[in-house]
Amino acid sequence: MEPRPLLLLLGLCSAGLVLGSEHETRLVAKLFEDYNSVVRPVEDHRQAVEVTVGLQLIQLINVDEVNQIVTTNVRLKQQWVDYNLKWNPDDYGGVKKIHIPSEKIWRPDLVLYNNADGDFAIVKFTKVLLDYTGHITWTPPAIFKSYCEIIVTHFPFDEQNCSMKLGTWTYDGSVVVINPESDQPDLSNFMESGEWVIKESRGWKHWVFYACCPSTPYLDITYHFVMQRLPLYFIVNVIIPCLLFSFLTGLVFYLPTDSGEKMTLSISVLLSLTVFLLVIVELIPSTSSAVPLIGKYMLFTMVFVIASIIITVIVINTHHRSPSTHVMPEWVRKVFIDTIPNIMFFSTMKRPSREKQDKKIFTEDIDISDISGKPGPPPMGFHSPLIKHPEVKSAIEGIKYIAETMKSDQESNNAAEEWKYVAMVMDHILLAVFMLVCIIGTLAVFAGRLIELNQQG
């Protein structure tokens, strides 16, 4: 291609751009020649400006349970007609739409009524889209921090019902009428949160009459959001560890008392649980309005572990009892030795021997009455003259003392074995009871809420 045609083509394109820019320049100059951004854009002051409002939710940034603040990223779409900003496209080179700064035109002073950080107004003055009919579309972005009553009773399986109340700050319903663009906020560009999911959303228009001016309506549009928390993070990091601590607590009663490690395991579990609770305490909403489910479960786990320590002390004390310190009541023997083992099929547990020694010591057949000088019973059969000897008498007396001592020791050992057997039976019972309480307690805390959520779908 030769240089001259190329230069001619570039010149024509540049001329078109200049002409287009000149048309917009003339148009803007004409539109704002006598424009007053303070005056409502109506032909008759008795007319009301109709503003269509639409809320587009982009992101759920944060839910602050303690301060009860929900932070969201939104786009607030506002549409109205300004009769002062109309033109004929044929007079301006076919220009039908232009973008102008929002500061130059009249705008509805929409604010977030339930704002929680003191900044009620929308302060991001982006450009508006204006067409030749005077129709204006303004979609400024905003970060809303709205107040929301956070109910943590069912945390972390909770649902929150939060709202955003939008309305004009100075205009009543007789001069500015706001209408919702739709009965639902726009979620087409919503970025999913890792902690919350929006189950339901709706928008309502309200006519409010205040006591100061009962004949004048004030309009607002309120958007409600039902948000459900995703509990997986708390299940993995809080609930399952607490369940494992409870399971370890029950295993304390499976450990033999003779090993001497019962209290060591119990205290170790308690210390581990305490450190664990100190680490995860920041994950739980620190509010006194209600005790959340996860707080109840952590309290249950702590009481569960402490109760196991107290009962373990009682079991160890029972295991080490002796006849010199405790006499076994008959009801204890009947319940823990005779009854419960049969009911619970403790066939593998060796019971203590309760047989009394019926065999008589051979010295009972020997006449030792003359040791004290008193006549004994008449002799039966052969009576050896050796027992008359003093040394023999002394030996017999010593043997009898040893036999009685051995018999006493045997009775003491039998009594001690009975106490150990009672402690062993208690361990077996408590193992079953604690495991059952661990399962029932967990279900009692969470099952009701989980069933309710399942029914809601």
Curated annotation (Swiss-Prot):
GO molecular function, one term: excitatory extracellular ligand-gated monoatomic ion channel activity
Positions on the Cytoplasmic side per record topology: 317-428
Superkingdom: Eukaryota
GO cellular component, one term: neuron projection
SUPFAM superfamilies reported for this sequence: Neurotransmitter-gated ion-channel transmembrane pore, Nicotinic receptor ligand binding domain-like
Alphabetical GO biological process terms: acetylcholine receptor signaling pathway; membrane depolarization; monoatomic ion transmembrane transport; neuromuscular synaptic transmission; response to nicotine; synaptic transmission, cholinergic
UniProtKB keywords: Cell membrane, Disulfide bond, Glycoprotein, Ion channel, Ion transport, Ligand-gated ion channel, Membrane, Postsynaptic cell membrane, Receptor, Signal, Synapse, Transmembrane, Transmembrane helix, Transport
Residue ranges annotated as Extracellular topological domain: 21-230
Membrane topology per record: Multi-pass membrane protein
Stretches that traverse the bilayer: 231-255, 263-281, 297-316, 429-447
Cystine crosslinks: 148-162, 212-213
Signal sequence segment: 1-20
Self-association state and partner proteins as the record states: One of the alpha chains that assemble within the acetylcholine receptor, a pentamer of two alpha chains, a beta, a delta, and a gamma (in immature muscle) or epsilon (in mature muscle) chains. The muscle heteropentamer composed of alpha-1, beta-1, delta, epsilon subunits interacts with the alpha-conotoxin ImII.
Family: Belongs to the ligand-gated ion channel (TC 1.A.9) family. Acetylcholine receptor (TC 1.A.9.1) subfamily. Alpha-1/CHRNA1 sub-subfamily.
PANTHER family, per database record: NEUROTRANSMITTER GATED ION CHANNEL
Identification of the protein by name: Acetylcholine receptor subunit alpha
Originating organism: Bos taurus (Bovine)
